[in-house]
Amino acid sequence: MKNTPVIIASIASLGIVISSVVLGSAFKNRNQSENTISVTGLGTKQFTSDLITWSGRFSRDSYEIKEAYNALAQDRKVIFDYLQSQGIKPNEVVFSAVDIEKKYNYSTDNEGNSRSTFAGYELSQKISIESKEVTKIENISRNITEIINKGIEFTSSSPQYFYTKLAGLKQEMIADATKDAKERAEKIAKNSGSGLGKLKKATMGVIQITAPNSDEDYSYGGTFNTHSKEKEASITIKLEYQVD
C-alpha cells in the first residue's frame, strides 16, 4: 500500500505526543508529592505519682493442714490489725485466696532409687494495698520488720506507682507536640523562602513514661515505668505540610 509509510509515521507521532503527556503528568505529580515538609514535634511532662500499690506474702508450714490454716488466719488478723493501726483503711486492703502446697523431701537410696517423703503443707496468702496516700504506704513497705517481729514469715514486694490523671496529661502533651511540630515546619518553610500550606497528614506516636534522667529504653509499643514515684512522660507528633 502506498499510504503505509504515512500511516506508520502518523502512529509514531501520536505515540510521541502521548508519551510526552504521560511523562509530563508523572513529573508534575512527582513534584507535587515531593513539595512537602515532614516534621516531628515532642511533648513532655514531668509529674509525681498519685497512686501506689504494694503487696506482700506470708506463709505457715505444718504437717497438719488445719493447723497451718489456723496459724495463717491468725497471722492475717495480726497483719490487718497492724495496718489499721498505721491508718490504712479496710477497703484498701485485699487478701487473696489461700495457696496450699504439699512439700516433699527427696532422697536416693544405696541402690540409686529415688524416694520422696511427705514433709508437710505450706499455706501462703498474698496481701495487696492500693491507696492514694503514697507516702504512708511507702513507709509501711520499708518497715516490714514491724510485721516480722510479730513472728510472721512475711516477704514484701517493691511498691508500684501510677498516675490517675494520665488521660488529661496526654491531651496536654499532644497539644504541646503539635505546636512544636508546626513551629518547626514554619521555620523550615521560612528559611527556604516558601510558605507553609495545608496540613496533609498527622501521625501520633505512643506515650513513653520513664523515670526522669534515666537510661530506660523507649519501646515500639510504649514504655510505662511503675517503679519510680517521679515520672517523665513524652509523646511525638509527626506532621506533613504542603509547601506553597
Predicted region positions:
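Short, charge-dense linear interaction motifs
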Residues: 1-244
